[in-house]
Amino acid sequence: MEEPQSDLSIELPLSQETFSDLWKLLPPNNVLSTLPSSDSIEELFLSENVTGWLEDSGGALQGVAAAAASTAEDPVTETPAPVASAPATPWPLSSSVPSYKTYQGDYGFRLGFLHSGTAKSVTCTYSPSLNKLFCQLAKTCPVQLWVNSTPPPGTRVRAMAIYKKLQYMTEVVRRCPHHERSSEGDSLAPPQHLIRVEGNLHAEYLDDKQTFRHSVVVPYEPPEVGSDCTTIHYNYMCNSSCMGGMNRRPILTIITLEDPSGNLLGRNSFEVRICACPGRDRRTEEKNFQKKGEPCPELPPKSAKRALPTNTSSSPPPKKKTLDGEYFTLKIRGHERFKMFQELNEALELKDAQASKGSEDNGAHSSYLKSKKGQSASRLKKLMIKREGPDSD
């Protein structure tokens, strides 16, 4: 088959002269249906309105560019937005350490606790020998307030927690981050407060602006009819072993009796351990306390060192020599030598018997051995007499 020859008469519109012809071939409904002439184009770009608009636009653009350049060279200082205050340090240090010494005052203020055992099911128990309260997390801990005479009206009771050891006393006792974010507990109390009061709508949770310490204050109520003391129910909202919180550091709870002006009327304190099994921990610590024989735990932390046992010595105690219970057979040639070794063995047996047995047994045994020894001595004399005589054939 013959290939069709290309039509050379068709030329591509490669010049500006053919562009107007192609423009006329476009359909009439096209947006660009009419091609403007060269005169109209010149009038468009050379009209006074367009020229003024371009000049105004150019001036505006130049002004914007100049403003941008000046801004880049000399930045304008904007008024900063109010910055939020920095959060408080996780462990704020207090400027003063409250005292925890017992002070009964003029009203004979003292504390009391309910008698409870050491069973596994108990949720709160107090050890008088340790002056320590063992309780579970967020469980009711009744504390009794005893006074000899009624304080003045408006008296308040304050509860505050501090660390027991000297190196941590300046730190504020607060809950761990995990329990702070939890929604459990009283909504009236701040989430960072460790001690809370149960069943008292007049409780006030205070943060000291100078020491940053947390405390809860309730008005003092006289004992009810038929009762000798006032009871306040406290809750501890974090475990002693929580990381980021107490972190196994022992704490003390200070209960103070104050007048309306804040003057101290009485003070008392006790150690607290918040754990999962209060009864078990109380038994363990009381046994350790009895074994160590430490002084009273109410003494200052400086004297809380472990006392060395008095019976310690560098050299071990001498060991008693134990008699060997084995028996051996010794072959001896000659009857005379046998008698001599027999007497020596009996003498050693007598010495051992005197060292091990009492005087009564030793007396009977020695008399028996002496009689036997006397018989052996007489036999030895007879043998010597026979040897002194003439030899027989």
UniProtKB/Swiss-Prot annotation:
Among the record's GO biological process terms, what is one? cellular senescence
**Region described as Interaction with USP7:** 359-363
Record's comment on post-translational modification: Phosphorylation on Ser residues mediates transcriptional activation. Phosphorylation at Ser-9 by HIPK4 increases repression activity on BIRC5 promoter. Phosphorylated on Thr-18 by VRK1, which may prevent the interaction with MDM2. Phosphorylated on Ser-20 by CHEK2 in response to DNA damage, which prevents ubiquitination by MDM2. Phosphorylated on Ser-20 by PLK3 in response to reactive oxygen species (ROS), promoting p53/TP53-mediated apoptosis. Phosphorylated on Ser-33 by CDK7 in a CAK complex in response to DNA damage. Phosphorylated by HIPK1. Monomethylated at Lys-372 by SETD7, leading to stabilization and increased transcriptional activation. Monomethylated at Lys-370 by SMYD2, leading to decreased DNA-binding activity and subsequent transcriptional regulation activity. Lys-372 monomethylation prevents interaction with SMYD2 and subsequent monomethylation at Lys-370. Dimethylated at Lys-373 by EHMT1 and EHMT2. Monomethylated at Lys-382 by KMT5A, promoting interaction with L3MBTL1 and leading to repress transcriptional activity.
Q: Which intervals of the chain are annotated as region Interaction with HIPK1?
A: 100-370
Record carries keyword rRNA processing: no
Q: Where do the record's region annotations for Interaction with DNA lie? A: 273-280
Q: For the modification N6-methyllysine, which residues carry it?
A: K370, K372, K382
Quote a single Gene Ontology cellular component term.
Answer: cytoplasm
Named from the GO MF annotations, one term is:
RNA polymerase II cis-regulatory region sequence-specific DNA binding
Q: Where is this region: Disordered?
A: 283-325, 352-393
Query: Any idea which residues bear N6-lactoyllysine here?
Result: K120, K139
Which co-factor is required?
Answer: Zn(2+)
Q: Please note every region of biased composition (Basic and acidic residues).
A: 283-295, 352-363
Q: What is its main location?
A: cytoplasm
Annotated Polar residues bias = 364-378
The cofactor note from the UniProt entry for this protein is: Binds 1 zinc ion per subunit.
Which residue ranges are recorded for the region named Basic (repression of DNA-binding)? Answer: 368-387
- As annotated in the record, motif Nuclear export signal runs over 339-350
Q: Which residues carry this modification: Omega-N-methylarginine?
A: R333
Residue(s) of cross-link: Glycyl lysine isopeptide (Lys-Gly) (interchain with G-Cter in ubiquitin): K24, K291, K292, K351, K357
Domain of life, per UniProt, equals Eukaryota
Domain remark from Swiss-Prot or TrEMBL: The N-terminal and C-terminal disordered regions undergo liquid-liquid phase separation (LLPS) following homotetramerization and activation. Post-translational modifications, such as phosphorylation or lactylation affect the ability to undergo LLPS.
| Protein family membership | Belongs to the p53 family.
**Alphabetical list of PANTHER family matching this protein:** CELLULAR TUMOR ANTIGEN P53
Role according to the record: Multifunctional transcription factor that induces cell cycle arrest, DNA repair or apoptosis upon binding to its target DNA sequence. Acts as a tumor suppressor in many tumor types; induces growth arrest or apoptosis depending on the physiological circumstances and cell type. Negatively regulates cell division by controlling expression of a set of genes required for this process. One of the activated genes is an inhibitor of cyclin-dependent kinases. Apoptosis induction seems to be mediated either by stimulation of BAX and FAS antigen expression, or by repression of Bcl-2 expression.
Q: What is this protein called?
A: Cellular tumor antigen p53
- Write the lineage as a comma-separated list: Eukaryota, Metazoa, Chordata, Craniata, Vertebrata
